[in-house]
Amino acid sequence: MQHPTPDALHARLAARRFILAGPCALEDFDVAMETAHAVREAAEAAGLFAVFKSSWDKANRTSITSFRGPGLVRGMEWLARIREESGLPVVTDIHLPEQAAPVAEVADIIQIPAFLCRQTDLLVAAAATGRVVNVKKGQFVAPWDMRPAVEKLRAAGNERILLTERGASFGYNNLVVDYRSIPTMQGFGVPVVFDATHSVQLPGGLGGSSGGERRHVPVLARAAVAAGVDGVFLECHPDPDKALCDGPNSWPLDRLPALLKELSALWSLEHVC
């Protein structure tokens, strides 16, 4: 399976109408592969470009007993197979600079987690791979304060950049979305993604894990498209209530086609307004 070069992939993402979708974590290979094929089918039916997302290690879980993932070696093996068999590019995150190079051997997009968006060494290491880099805006960071993250990546020689809005802390155990962040961050000359599922998360809201209000995912995603976002990030799962990570805010896989068709229709309206 031939995949786009980093430059070609970034150009396609800059052309808008795309999704980054998949389970929160690689909890099971068969579940991940099933999800990847379903994401591709739903995206194609809606006329959207798709990238498969999932994490090989969830290093920022609430509890020491929380499921984290299969680890680097097995995780890269799984993602390589999913990438080849589904035909989708893949995005996954790193947490330490030394993880950038091995992850870049498989991933088309390297993602910087929200809590690590200011870590200079991590950003520079991701940039040095030459891959597209998606930096998630921290819940504690103002949209205009993401400009330095972009400047760090560019200073390291990488212009293939995405920024992702995923909500801002709003008191305790809650997030709120300020849609002004979309045009603000687009003003840095990069495509902007909206994370519709983490934005409905209730961080630590279940005590030993995070809660979520997935019923709000569609309205937040539609609002982001109406606000001019370039792409939408969606965690989805065949059975969210049994997911080992972020189930409360994950979108049911069987409801993904309808949601993507709604988003596609809204993106199409931009051309007639």
UniProtKB/Swiss-Prot annotation:
Q: Which GO terms describe its cellular component?
A: cytoplasm
Q: What is its EC number?
A: 2.5.1.55
* InterPro entries in UniProt: Aldolase_TIM, DAHP1/KDSA, KDO8P_synthase
Q: Which UniProt keywords apply?
A: Cytoplasm, Lipopolysaccharide biosynthesis, Transferase
UniProt pathway annotation: Carbohydrate biosynthesis; 3-deoxy-D-manno-octulosonate biosynthesis; 3-deoxy-D-manno-octulosonate from D-ribulose 5-phosphate: step 2/3; Bacterial outer membrane biogenesis; lipopolysaccharide biosynthesis
Keyword Lyase on this protein?
Answer: no
Instruction: Supply the Gene3D superfamilies for this chain.
Output: Aldolase class I (3.20.20.70)
Top EC class for this record:
transferase
Catalysed reaction per UniProt? Answer: D-arabinose 5-phosphate + phosphoenolpyruvate + H2O = 3-deoxy-alpha-D-manno-2-octulosonate-8-phosphate + phosphate
User: Which GO annotations describe the biological process of this protein?
Assistant: keto-3-deoxy-D-manno-octulosonic acid biosynthetic process
- GO molecular-function term, one example from the UniProt record: 3-deoxy-8-phosphooctulonate synthase activity
Transmembrane spans? none
The subcellular location is: Cytoplasm
Domain of life, per UniProt, equals Bacteria
Q: Which family does it belong to?
A: Belongs to the KdsA family.
Protein name, as recorded? 2-dehydro-3-deoxyphosphooctonate aldolase
The coding gene here is kdsA
